[in-house]
């Protein structure tokens, strides 16, 4: 035991000058930190404040009323006579929203233009709208106006579905369609309430259709390029700061199927252009 003690003492004494020498050469260096709170950087894409607010909605409804209600078609071709839209009473969005509120939902999306191009408000962008409806109830219909007013009255979130694809428009597939029809429609819808939480742009883009009597197939390629998404996003967010753009626009997307199957934990790992 004594031999071990002597050996350790000798080692400690022999190391002392080395440690002392190293300490005399050590000095602190000042450094400016760009991250003063020492927060770790993101590992994956992070949700924006707008996306987080959208996520808090949790459970909301989708109201698909329009020309398809009277043609009994899932997707209209765009050649439907406007007079077919002839409701026997004034549509009542407040009744719709009261029903979903009773179910515990926090809001709803109203389809105001599907792929057939028929607009449920008196738009200046096309004649394929309620302006030429088959009766007075139809011609007086303005779903964006009445849906927004009802949602605000009930304290619910609201937004609109507007299809980028337009099987009625003779301009579809051209730059003029994007500028004079689609973007104008989005701008009009934005005027129906700056507190909209979502604008839904369907992923179905291009295919066969009426197209003003051309009856052909049109493919537009990359939707983000054709619909001028940077301009669309900036224009919408300038007026609707909390409005998430679903589908075209890249802030929210479908789960990958129309049956509603999803993993227990699911978060989009892509950025706005993926």
Feature roles, as predicted:
Residues 1-27:
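Bacterial Sec-dependent N-terminal signal peptides
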């Amino acid at each position: 035991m004594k031999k071990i003690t002597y050996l350790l003492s000798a080692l400690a004494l022999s190391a002392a000058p080395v440690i002392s020498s190293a300490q005399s050469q050590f000095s602190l260096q000042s450094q400016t930190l760009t991250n003063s709170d020492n927060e770790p950087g993101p590992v994956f894409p992070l949700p924006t404040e707008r996306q987080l607010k959208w996520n808090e909605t949790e459970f909301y409804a989708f109201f698909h009323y329009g020309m398809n209600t009277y043609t009994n078609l899932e997707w209209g071709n765009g050649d439907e006579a406007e007079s077919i839209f002839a409701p026997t009473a004034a549509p009542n969005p407040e009744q719709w929203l009261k029903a979903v509120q009773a179910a515990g939902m926090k809001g709803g999306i109203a389809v105001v233009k599907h792929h057939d191009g028929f607009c449920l408000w008196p738009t200046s962008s096309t004649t394929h709208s309620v302006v030429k409806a088959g009766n007075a109830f139809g011609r007086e219909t303005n779903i964006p106006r009445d849906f927004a007013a009802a949602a605000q009255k009930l304290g619910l979130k609201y937004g609109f579905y507007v299809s980028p694809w337009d099987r009625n428009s003779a301009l579809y597939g051209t730059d003029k369609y994007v500028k004079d029809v689609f973007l104008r429609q989005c701008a009009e819808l934005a005027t129906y309430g700056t507190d909209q939480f979502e604008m839904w742009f369907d992923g179905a883009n291009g295919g066969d259709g009426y197209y003003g009597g051309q009856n052909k197939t049109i493919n537009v390629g990359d939707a983000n390029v054709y619909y001028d998404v940077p301009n669309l996003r900036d224009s919408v967010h300038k007026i609707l700061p909390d409005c998430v753009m679903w589908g075209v626009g890249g802030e929210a997307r479908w789960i990958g199927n129309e049956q509603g199957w999803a993993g227990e934990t699911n978060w989009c790992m892509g950025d706005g252009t993926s």
